[in-house]
Regions:
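Structured C-terminal cap/extension of enzyme domains
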Residues: 39, 43-44, 172-289
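Short hydrophobic/aromatic-enriched beta-strand-loop microsegments
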Residues: 69-72, 157-165, 236-242
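Conserved, mostly hydrophobic/aromatic
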Residues: 6, 18, 46, 59, ...
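Alpha-helix-loop-beta-strand connector modules within alpha/beta enzyme cores
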Residues: 56-75, 123-132, 180-182
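Glycine/proline-rich, positively charged
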Residues: 26-29, 36, 40, 79-186, ...
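A general structural detector for well-ordered alpha-helical segments in enzyme core domains, enriched
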Residues: 2, 34-35, 58-62, 87-91, ...
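Conserved residues at the C-terminal ends of beta-strands
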Residues: 19, 49, 103-106, 141, ...
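N-terminal binding-site loop/beta-alpha segment at the start of enzyme catalytic domains
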Residues: 1-70
């Protein structure tokens, strides 16, 4: 397993991490088996969120006795200091840990990011928690390119998480800017929320970009983990055949895949089209149709 330094945090993490959304559909014992398999294979970065129902709780059980071997990241949708402080304490309890390595502001559109940074905003609680040793570092996750651009200019941002995959590569220049500014870049949605079925080609594509610090595919069983490990541990250049597969995937999804650019807005019926598409992509890993 290749390891990278997660930007300004200085944390040494595996090139592939563990995305904690799919474990909502298994159980605590299944999560424990996955955690031990991660440890055996050198995967040391785990991502979850307050909003992922039982994910934090399952991970807290699954990491019993081995917590110190992992870099643990979670996130909250809270925008005020009071709500964020409560969420940090809940995360600590759920994850059965005295500290969380990386705590992230979850999916903040530009207007919310301004609230987070304002007096009484969530950043106050995150900074206080960092001073108290409850969390180690502060990051942000986003689906908006404008949020990504804004985050790059904020001195307190140590990591940025954003969708990046074969069909969603519109942030490539911003990802390169992360590398130049020593901001860790975390690639989420490497399979485009399940739209890309060829996981090996998808992960190989993401890891071919040297500016990506870590990719975090979701996994619900050992078979998925083994498949993802084989892809990420293959450091050979992309082959002509793989490049052809990538073009075919882009062609197949290019006219129907939502990139959340919002060029389709405003909707005459008042529907947030990109929000609906995002909800569908989030439901897919949970087995919802």
């Amino acid at each position: 397993m290749e390891y990278r330094i997660l930007g300004k945090t200085g944390l040494k993490i595996s090139r592939m991490g563990f995305g904690g959304i799919p474990i909502q559909r298994i159980d605590a014992e299944g999560t424990k088996a996955l955690m031990h398999k991660l440890l055996e294979n050198g995967v040391n970065y785990i991502d979850t969120a307050r909003g992922y129902t039982v994910s934090e709780e399952y991970l807290g059980i699954g990491l019993e006795g081995i917590r110190e071997h992992f870099v643990l990241a979670t996130k909250s949708m809270s925008r005020t200091a009071e709500a964020m402080a409560k969420d940090i304490d809940i995360s600590l309890k759920n994850l059965c840990t005295s500290y969380i390595d990386l705590y992230q502001i979850h999916n903040a559109p530009p207007a919310d990011l301004e609230k987070v940074c304002a007096p009484g905003g969530a950043l106050e609680a995150l900074t206080a928690a960092k001073t108290a040793g409850k969390i180690g570092h502060i990051g942000i996750t986003a689906h908006s390119l404008e949020t990504f651009r804004m985050a790059l200019e904020l001195p307190w941002v140590e990591t940025i998480m954003f969708p990046y995959n074969i069909v969603e590569d519109q942030a490539k220049e911003l990802i390169h800017a992360c590398a130049e500014k020593s901001i860790g870049f975390i690639a989420m949605k490497p399979l485009a929320g399940g739209a890309i079925e060829d996981a090996v080609t998808a992960l190989r594509c993401v890891c071919a970009n040297p500016d990506v610090t870590v990719v975090i595919p979701g996994m619900a069983d050992i078979a998925e983990l083994n498949q993802n490990l084989a892809a990420v541990n293959d450091s050979s250049p992309l082959s002509v055949e793989e490049e052809a597969k990538m073009r075919a995937i882009r062609d197949a999804l290019g006219t129907q895949f939502c990139r959340r650019c919002n060029y389709c807005q405003p909707c005459s019926a008042g529907i947030s089209i990109s929000s609906v598409a995002l909800a569908v992509s989030r439901a897919r890993p949970l087995g919802e149709q």
